[in-house]
């Protein structure tokens, strides 16, 4: 029995999918060694002013000095009031609108320009396999392809504004074994990368491919992708996915990969906040139902930072405190909704940790921010 299982006997009232062992994540933060640099989280979704303040506490406890967030355009100013200069923004479409064709097309271009006017210098192009479902509902199955004409129009606008790109390509191998088993609809996993490679060649500014480029299960593939495209960077966001798959990578092979591409691998969490996390879970959408009060919301946010820091900087070896439903999805006869994989820490050398947590993002993105600030000064 590990120390978390023992802790579960002390406070079972705290047990939830983000806290399988009922631990105090605020107290746990003090057990980490202080870092000589602030962590830069390049991938989050911070919305909701009340939830944002709970996230702010978790971020401060776990050493996050700067957060890049896919905040909805209408909430950018509210988030600035909470975080000041410790948050920067990534342009995204309006996902909640009723006119998807407009929101993914001309409406997205309008929002890119709106974000840019507020100092944002990164645009996110989401192209997960399930985006085909949105495209079909609009009436054009190809609309959400990364290289569709509509997407390229938006990319050209962002490019002309001097913005960098972020993208979501593919999804976990577990999803291709289950949700995406019908390749005639979703394509194979390798199929997802053909549009990306074409766009990397056309738009040569830096790209950040989220979630270890969508294939943390296959470092060999990522080696080739990064070699072919020097403008490509990866972030390490999506805690459950990274815990499950990075834990399985042999430490030496992972270190060799991170060493070879030092400066091109950026830390991210993919934490999602919303004020719905503070209300009882009745008739909520999946993302909103992940928490139903302030304590659960804090656990939801802090657990990701706890787990990711353990993964990268420690020799932790034990079950993850975060439930991973993918286990049950793949093997329902062997797993429950509350089961979790082993978290096997990789104890990265300090130079690689510094690059991952801070230096890579600072070197890549700080010049963009400086340009934004200079432009704002000139307009005054």
Regions found by a protein language model. Name each.
Residues 31-33, 56-61, 75-88, 110-120, ...:
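Acidic (Asp/Glu)-rich catalytic clusters
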Residues 52-54, 80, 101-102, 177-200, ...:
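Distinct, well-ordered alpha-helical segments
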Residues 206-208, 212-380:
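H/E-rich (His + Asp/Glu) clusters that bind or coordinate divalent metals
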């Amino acid at each position: 029995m590990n120390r978390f299982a023992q802790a579960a006997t002390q406070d079972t009232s705290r047990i939830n999918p983000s806290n399988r062992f009922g631990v105090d994540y605020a107290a746990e933060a003090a057990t980490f060694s202080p870092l000589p640099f602030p962590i830069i989280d390049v991938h989050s979704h911070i919305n909701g002013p009340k939830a944002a303040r709970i996230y702010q506490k978790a971020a401060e406890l776990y050493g996050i000095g700067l957060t890049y967030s896919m905040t909805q355009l209408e909430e950018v100013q509210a988030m600035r009031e909470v975080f000041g200069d410790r948050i920067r923004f990534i342009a995204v479409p309006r996902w909640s609108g009723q006119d998807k064709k407009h929101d993914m097309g001309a409406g997205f271009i309008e929002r890119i320009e709106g974000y840019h006017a507020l100092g944002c210098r990164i645009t996110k192009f989401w192209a997960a396999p399930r985006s085909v479902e949105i495209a079909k509902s609009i009436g054009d199955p190809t609309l959400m392809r990364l290289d569709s004409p509509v997407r390229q129009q938006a990319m050209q606008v962002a490019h002309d504004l001097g913005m960098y790109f972020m993208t979501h390509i593919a999804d976990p191998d577990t999803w291709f074994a289950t949700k995406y088993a019908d390749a005639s609809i979703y394509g194979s996993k390798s199929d997802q990368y053909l549009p990306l490679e074409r766009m990397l060649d056309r738009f040569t500014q830096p790209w950040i491919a989220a979630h270890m480029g969508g294939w943390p299960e296959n470092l060999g593939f990522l080696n080739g992708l990064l070699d072919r495209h020097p403008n490509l960077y990866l972030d390490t966001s999506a805690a459950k996915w990274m815990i499950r798959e990075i834990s399985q990578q042999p430490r030496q092979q992972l270190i060799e990969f991170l060493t070879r591409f030092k400066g091109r691998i950026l830390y991210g969490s993919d934490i999602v906040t919303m004020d719905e996390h503070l209300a009882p879970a009745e008739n909520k959408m999946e993302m909103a139902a992940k928490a139903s009060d302030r304590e659960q919301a804090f656990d939801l946010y802090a657990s990701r930072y706890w787990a990711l820091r353990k993964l990268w900087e420690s020799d932790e070896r034990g079950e993850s405190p975060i439930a991973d439903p993918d286990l049950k999805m793949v093997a329902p006869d062997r797993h429950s909704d509350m089961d979790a994989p082993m978290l096997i820490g990789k104890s990265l050398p300090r130079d690689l940790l510094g690059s991952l947590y801070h230096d890579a993002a600072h070197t890549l993105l700080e010049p963009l921010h400086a340009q934004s600030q200079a432009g704002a000064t000139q307009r005054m």
